[in-house]
């Protein structure tokens, strides 16, 4: 791969986007230096000049062939979890182990990838956990549709703390959660609501979602905004963290079925469009949308996740694969899942790894960058 001044091509391409991002916002280029993009403006101009050189066009064409994204540098591995678990979501812990919701057995699961050993923690009678994330306290937090509650599990003692929804919310069909930068947990319920939980005092506030049922995926951006997607409503929404009110943002394709959302490092919101078979992105800087048709026959994009290199990962039920999308080259790369009809419903990662839950096979899957 081409290297310039110690930067690999993907880094240069991302730097080019960063430079364009800054230009679009009319920020003085000197700010780039103070934000550690690079040390000197002259180096920026040299780098951008290199990016626009014809030699890069040649290299770019080479980079986007069948071996684009250097897919051969990645390995894919599955980990078996107890039968009947039907894992729905995964959440890597700081120590490299993996939490997962065992929706089929009403438990929280834990996998040590170095040994393959799993353990399960019971969450209570009627539990049907959907989402799990690791909070700022390093503990797993679960959205449990069966218990109609948010559940925190102590990662050391396995002690559970249940935050039940208000009694007037009979069944929220709890889905996914995210922490904002103030430590407030925001969550969605497909029955037609979203809410906030203050872990410090246990207070929960519920809001009715626009257009009724549908709230599904939710994400926090680097600048602290919180967005959720509505599958039935076919929109994404930005939440005002003070009032709880939302601004609806509709993708260009009608009835597209926005299912999950994730933010990249530029605060852009990536959307898996279940009904339309597209990958969408919303840019809050200029309030613009873009969409790409996912390759293959009748694609069904479910999960979406953006890694530390701003590469976008999608699970596709139709092709039984995970896809990696480069937003600068606008190219997809495909990783076929080893087990047929895996149904990966959620993706999350840590440095150099992307994890998914195979809800139909009682397995977790990892894509890992080789050294």
PLM segments and residue spans:
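Short, compositionally biased, intrinsically disordered N-terminal export/targeting signals
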Residues: 2-19, 44
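A short helix->beta-strand "capping" segment at the edge of beta-propeller domains
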Residues: 63-83
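A short loop-to-beta-strand structural motif that recurs across blades of beta-propeller domains
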Residues: 107-109, 149-151, 193-195, 235-237, ...
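Short loop/turn segments that connect beta-strands within beta-propeller blades
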Residues: 112-116, 154-158, 198-202, 240-244, ...
């Amino acid at each position: 791969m081409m290297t310039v001044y110690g930067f690999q091509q993907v880094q240069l391409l991302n730097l080019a986007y960063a430079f364009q991002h800054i230009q679009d916002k009319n920020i003085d280029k000197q700010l780039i230096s103070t934000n550690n993009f690079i040390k000197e403006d002259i180096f920026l101009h040299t780098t951008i000049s290199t990016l626009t050189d014809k030699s890069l066009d040649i290299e770019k064409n080479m980079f986007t062939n069948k071996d684009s994204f250097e897919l051969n540098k990645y390995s894919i591995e599955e980990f078996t979890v107890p039968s009947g678990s039907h894992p729905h979501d995964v959440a890597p812990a700081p120590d490299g182990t993996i939490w997962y919701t065992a929706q089929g057995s009403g438990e929280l699961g834990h996998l040590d990838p170095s040994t393959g050993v799993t353990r399960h923690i019971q969450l209570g009678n009627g539990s049907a956990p959907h989402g799990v994330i690791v909070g700022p306290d390093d503990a797993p937090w679960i959205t449990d549709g069966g218990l109609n509650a948010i559940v925190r599990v102590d990662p050391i003692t396995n002690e559970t703390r249940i935050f039940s929804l208000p009694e007037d919310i009979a069944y929220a069909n709890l889905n996914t959660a995210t922490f904002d930068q103030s430590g407030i947990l925001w969550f969605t319920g497909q029955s037609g609501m979203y809410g906030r939980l203050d872990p410090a005092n246990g207070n929960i506030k519920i809001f009715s979602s626009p257009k009724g049922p549908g709230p599904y995926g939710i994400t926090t951006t680097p600048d602290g905004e919180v967005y959720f997607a509505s599958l039935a409503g076919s929109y994404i929404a930005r939440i005002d963290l003070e009032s709880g009110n939302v601004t609806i943002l509709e993708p260009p394709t009608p009835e597209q079925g926005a299912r999950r959302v994730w933010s990249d490092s530029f605060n852009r919101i990536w959307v898996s469009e279940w009904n339309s078979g597209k990958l969408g992105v919303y840019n809050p800087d200029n309030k613009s949308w873009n969409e790409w048709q996912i390759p293959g026959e009748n694609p069904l994009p479910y999960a979406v996740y953006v890694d530390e290199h701003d590469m976008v990962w999608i699970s596709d039920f139709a092709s039984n694969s995970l896809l990696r999308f480069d937003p600068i080259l606008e190219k997809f790369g495909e990783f076929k899942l080893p087990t047929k009809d895996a149904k990966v419903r959620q993706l999350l990662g840590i440095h150099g790894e992307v994890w998914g839950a195979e809800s139909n096979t009682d397995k977790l899957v990892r894509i890992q960058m080789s050294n």
